[in-house]
Design a protein with these regions (language model features):
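A short coil-to-beta-strand element that immediately follows conserved catalytic motifs
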Residues: 99-108
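Alpha-helical scaffold elements lining the catalytic groove of polysaccharide deacetylases
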Residues: 20, 69-99, 115-152
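Active-site beta->alpha N-cap acidic-glycine motif
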Residues: 1-72, 78, 85, 89, ...
Length: 152
C-alpha cells in the first residue's frame, strides 16, 4: 500500500456470511476486481465453504478477531488472545484443506468497530499492518435504504 499511489482498496468486514459472500465474490469476478475480506474467526468456523471460496478466488484475507469483539470492552490480554485465536484458525485454513498462505501474508488486521486501546494497537502493530477505513456506507443498517447507502 504505497501512500503515493492513487488507488481504491475494496474491503469487506465480518464474513464469511453465506447470504452475502458468494454474491459479493461473483460481482467482483464479473468486474475482475480483487478485494480484502476481514474475516471473523467464528464465521470461518461456521461457514468454511464461503471461506474457501474467498481464498480460492485469490482475495486477500485479514483478521477481524474471532468473536468480533470491541477492543474498548476487553482487557489487552483477552483482546489479543481473541485476535490470536482468529489468526491460528485462519492459518489452519479454517479446518479445511486450502492453501491460505498466498492470501494471508503479510498479516492484516482491522479492529471491529474501529476501536481498540493504545496498548492493544501497539502490540498488534508488531505483527500486523493495521488497516482502518475511509468510508462507511452504513449498508448494514436495517433503517438505511439502498439509495442512502450509495450516497454515503
Amino acid at each position: 500500500m504505497d501512500p503515493n499511489e492513487k488507488a481504491v482498496y475494496l474491503t469487506f468486514d465480518d464474513g464469511p456470511i453465506p447470504e452475502v459472500t458468494p454474491w459479493v465474490l461473483d460481482l467482483l469476478d464479473k468486474h475482475n476486481i480483487k478485494a480484502t475480506f476481514f474475516m471473523v474467526g467464528d464465521n470461518i468456523r461456521k461457514h468454511p465453504d464461503e471461506f474457501r471460496m474467498v481464498v480460492e478466488r485469490g482475495h486477500r484475507i485479514g483478521n477481524h478477531t474471532f468473536n468480533h469483539i470491541r477492543g474498548f470492552e476487553y482487557t489487552a490480554k483477552n483482546y489479543l488472545g481473541n485476535t490470536e485465536q482468529a489468526k491460528i484458525f485462519m492459518e489452519m485454513g479454517g479446518d479445511i484443506n486450502c492453501n491460505v498462505e498466498k492470501v494471508l501474508y503479510p498479516l492484516l488486521f482491522r479492529p471491529p468497530h474501529g476501536h481498540m486501546f493504545a496498548n492493544q494497537y501497539l502490540t498488534l502493530k508488531r505483527t500486523y499492518k493495521i488497516v482502518m477505513w475511509d468510508l462507511v456506507t452504513r449498508d448494514y443498517s436495517k433503517r438505511m435504504r439502498p439509495e442512502q447507502a450509495l450516497n454515503n
